Amino acid sequence: MAKTSLKIKQARHAKFKVRAYTRCKRCGRPHAVYRKFGICRLCFRHLAYNGSLPGVKKSSW
């Protein structure tokens, strides 16, 4: 989990656009965040397996 100070720091507007980065809305993880959902891959996997994300299902071929 991300520290509270890092979450607050991310919430502030960045002085330069290149300094802005995505952070998971659920756990605050800064890496591997899907832009479409706004959550990291770990939270995405957990929510998808539980059926909490509508329209998302496990693929098999």
From Swiss-Prot:
Keyword Protease on this protein? no
Residue sites binding Zn(2+) per the record: C24, C27, C40, C43
Q: Which UniProt keywords apply?
A: Metal-binding, Ribonucleoprotein, Ribosomal protein, RNA-binding, rRNA-binding, Zinc
GO: which molecular function terms?
rRNA binding; structural constituent of ribosome; zinc ion binding
InterPro entries linked: Ribosomal_uS14 (IPR001209), Ribosomal_uS14_bact (IPR023053), Ribosomal_uS14_CS (IPR018271), Ribosomal_uS14_sf (IPR043140)
Q: Which PROSITE patterns match?
A: RIBOSOMAL_S14 (PS00527)
Could you tell me the Gene Ontology terms of the biological process aspect for this record?
A: translation
Q: Which GO terms describe its cellular component?
A: cytoplasm; small ribosomal subunit
Co-factor: note: Binds 1 zinc ion per subunit.
Q: Which cofactor does it need?
A: Zn(2+)
* SUPFAM superfamilies according to UniProt: Glucocorticoid receptor-like (DNA-binding domain)
Q: Does the keyword Lyase apply?
A: no
Family statement drawn from the similarity comment of this UniProt entry: Belongs to the universal ribosomal protein uS14 family. Zinc-binding uS14 subfamily.
Q: How does it assemble?
A: Part of the 30S ribosomal subunit. Contacts proteins S3 and S10.
**Task performed by this protein:** Binds 16S rRNA, required for the assembly of 30S particles and may also be responsible for determining the conformation of the 16S rRNA at the A site.
Q: Which HAMAP family match?
A: Ribosomal_uS14_2_B (MF_01364_B)
Q: Which PANTHER family match?
A: 30S RIBOSOMAL PROTEIN S14, SMALL RIBOSOMAL SUBUNIT PROTEIN US14M
Designated name of the protein: Small ribosomal subunit protein uS14
Q: Which organism is it from?
A: Mycoplasmoides gallisepticum (strain R(low / passage 15 / clone 2)) (Mycoplasma gallisepticum)
Q: Which gene encodes it?
A: rpsZ
